[in-house]
A protein has these predicted regions:
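Glycine-biased, small-residue-rich flexible motifs in mid-sequence functional cores and linkers
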Residues: 1-156
């Protein structure tokens, strides 16, 4: 199961790739279920809601707020066995997810170049839970070795 935030960029790609591979996906959104953000993800959100799962910690009609996205990221840390970083910036909301993973004792997989760029990945509480990778192939191998993932030919 791929759990991601339905944001533009890698989140969208993660959801679409999971579905294309016949897997399952969970979208944890930073808005209430009656809203889509970004708006051009409304059809994807509806498709995930129909065939997979969309989760929100916010009641219907809740106005959008910037603090919703760190809350969404912390919720993803609680739902997932591990977090795989692909991209993040110095002020990225992903740091909230990584911090929550560390507090929960969950693993974080991150590319070496992010470790070299981001101070928040070097914190003493995050470091013991962090595994670095250089290539996407190495990331896949690390995840497969670290997590109890059942591989099947098809999903029902």
């Amino acid at each position: 199961v791929v759990i991601s935030g339905l944001a533009a960029g890698i989140d969208r790609v993660a959801h679409e790739a999971a579905m294309a591979a016949g897997g399952r996906t969970i979208a944890v959104i930073g808005t209430s279920l009656d809203r889509a953000y970004p708006k051009d993800h409304a059809a994807l959100q509806a498709r995930i809601a129909e065939d997979h799962l969309v989760v929100s910690p916010f009641a219907a009609g809740t106005p959008m707020s910037a603090w919703h996205f760190p809350k969404r990221n912390r919720l993803m840390a609680h739902l997932a066995q591990a977090t795989v970083l692909i991209e993040a910036g110095a002020t990225s909301g992903t740091r909230h997810q990584v911090s929550a993973c560390a507090a929960l004792g969950r693993q974080v997989f991150a590319p070496v170049h992010l470790l070299e760029q981001l101070d928040w990945l070097q914190s003493a509480k995050v470091r013991p839970h962090l595994q670095a990778w250089r290539t996407h192939e190495e990331a896949v191998q690390l995840v497969l070795e670290a997590l109890p993932i059942e591989r099947t030919a098809s999903h029902s």
